[in-house]
């Protein structure tokens, strides 16, 4: 989906399906990322970040340069919020919604068991 996207800078987003570690995303009518949060009540979310992105070299460079300038004052700044900073201030990051992607983040064996039972059947 991202490879075929017309956007040079895009993030894959799905409808909210998970119950752990979500990053909710908000985007405008042009599909440009405008906000993200782990708290779904903090924004008008349109989906959930999967963690797969297509970034141009120039976007990635700006992101790395900006992150380097922020690390001293914001040492726990996650890449999700760095993507948001760049999208808001420098270059738009477009949201590509895919309703057919079924996924699950696996952090431990318990997650793996859950994924095998509930997600693998869609593969």
Features from the language model and the residues they span:
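Short, acidic Gly/Pro/Ser/Thr-rich loop/turn segments
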Residues: 19, 60-62, 111-113
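Short, basic/aromatic-enriched C-terminal tail that caps enzymatic domains
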Residues: 107-123
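Short, solvent-exposed polar/charged micro-motifs at secondary-structure junctions
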Residues: 21-23, 103-108
